[in-house]
Amino acid sequence: MGICFSAGDVSSGLLIFSAMQQEDDLKALENIVQFARGLGVFFLVLHVYWYCYEWLSSCGLTYGYADRLLLDIQRTTLLFSSPVVTKLCAFLFLALGCYGTKSVRNGRVARRHIIAAACLGFPLFFLNGFLLSLPAGIGFRGWSYTLTLGAGYLCLLAAGVWLRRLMKQPLMDDPFNDNNESFLQEERCISNDCSVNLPTRYRYKGQWRNGWISVVNVYRSTAVIGLPGSGKSYAVLNNYIKQHIEKGFSMLVYDYKFDDLTRIAYNHLLRHLDKYAVKPKFCIINFDDPHRSNRCNPIDARFMDDISDAYESAYVTLLNLNKTWVDKQGDFFTDSAVILLAAIIWYLKIYDNGCYCTFPHAIEFLCQPLERIFPILSSYPELENYLSPFMDAWKSNAQDQLQGQVASVKIPLSRMISPQLYWVLTGNDFTLDINNPEEPKILCMGNNPDRQSIYGAALGLYNSRLIRLINKKGKLKSSLIIDELPTIYIRGLDNLIATARSNKVSVCLGFQDFSQLERDYGEKEAKVIINTVGNIFSGQVVGDTARTLSERFGKIVQLRESHSVSNENVTTSTNTQLETLIPVSKISNLTQGMFVGSVADNFDERIEQKIFHAEIVIDNDKVKAETAAYVPIPEISSFIGEDGKDHMEEIVKENYYRVKADVAELVLREIARIEADPKLSQLLPKKKQG
């Protein structure tokens, strides 16, 4: 009868054989260690016998055979030619014995104990030779030398054993897993006629390396995210401004803290005017200081083609004045306010060839009595259907409803009634088509954190009108740099990001985190902006923003080591695991100037490693020298009269009252026209018909 063995039996047998083989190997190693340690003690005994021979002889501890043997060894090997030779031999075998010791690992052994034992043992063991030449008795010299030699040997033995017992924990060398999470990054500088190139330093496997962030396709838009102080403007936005001016871009800069970015743009333009085929005009919108501001009419009749343009202008302005309206689209009072303001803007556009079509005129017209506003507006067929909800309430004498509808637009707009705002909004120093090949512009719009809710409405209107004008074919390449994006609402920004690439419009948006953008732009629009941006830079951010970015950067295969410590040895197992490339904790703890992110590439400019985690290198000395050489922004508008005095306040106020007078005169003319027409006169209140 045959004997059958199962696969399990064979496997168990192999494991038992392997364990037995391992045990035999350990026993053999232990024997070698004991032998090495014994040799060390043997050399130590030989050393004492040779160099303390006189003392041992007086004690009757010498032997003729041993004497002859040692003399023969000395003649052939010169082992005793110097005391250091035998000491080194003893020390060598001591070290081998300690290295191979199968000792109990103890994490509580401190390095200071090892250092103390070694510092005590080395002098006692190697530097005690002077004791043999002391002017003392032979017994004292022998005993003192032997005791110090033995004590030194024991101290060195203790240091060696403790060093072996000192449990080395490889994971503690990299407690934050920095080396394992480091990765090779792009080290080539890939440049083209629109790229932004930033030098970097990054760590890979514990070593600093030089790299480059090459944004070769700026037309796929860029988001620069980071908490205050993370270095967004200094490291990224400033470089976008400088490098795009150097490459001949027309530009819009939204300068939230005027004039930080404006000063950079102006001075850099002065140095690089030769990069433009047509010299660009440098324009500024600054409501705080009319001296340093151009004037521009954002609702210029020449650039409004139909009533939808008026609706967009009204919508943007009111949403900037009431950020909560972003989530109230479709609400009765919200839509009523937008429609009424849009109707007024379009009315001013079609009246007298649009000579009164400015936003201050629209505000002043809205402040007229209702019994004048509605008859005038409804007397135009283009607005009759547009205003039907208001006219129904007007004809049915629903005054409470009508007053509520009008108040919903009048109250927020009343905050914009300001002589300085009126001054800037009623002029025509330039047009908003900044990428016009015949008249390119560098336009800087300045806000003021103390008045951002008021200025933001006008600036949001400028920006919204501008992006509709520049996102067209056949224009110059242009760059939009928007710092602190949530402080203004720009309608159509999501559409611009999605379509601007074909029209050579670069968009660079700076903001603090995604939640801030969702609060001021609404969840849906914010998600579209976030998900359609092709290039992203992020400094330190926390919470959901850090988690979203970490997921966006994906995962990488990492090497994992597991250490199991026992009384016998340390067992190490190694495996690979798919882990997050840049974890949330890293993004949440980035230092100033360190950025993570990714870039988009082109068909003919491939970037294999698009993701980066690096410090953007800024030559601080060079930047300081450039800043020190900057010239101040000159006055754009002069209010100096013939008497040599500055009459800015008087001129600005005169313009303010002129707008009011224009509207009052316009209303009188329109009422007279309506009264003279039998059909239209029915639109007037009954008291007017008598």
Language model region names:
Residues 497-499, 503-600:
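Conserved ATP-driven motor cores of ASCE-family P-loop NTPases powering translocation/secretion/packaging/pilus
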Residues 14-230, 234, 239, 247, ...:
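Basic- and hydrophobic-enriched, low-structure N-terminal and domain-boundary segments
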Residues 7, 58-61, 168-172, 176, ...:
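P-loop NTPase motor domains
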Residues 7-10, 19:
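Acidic, Ala/Val/Gly-enriched low-complexity intrinsically disordered segments
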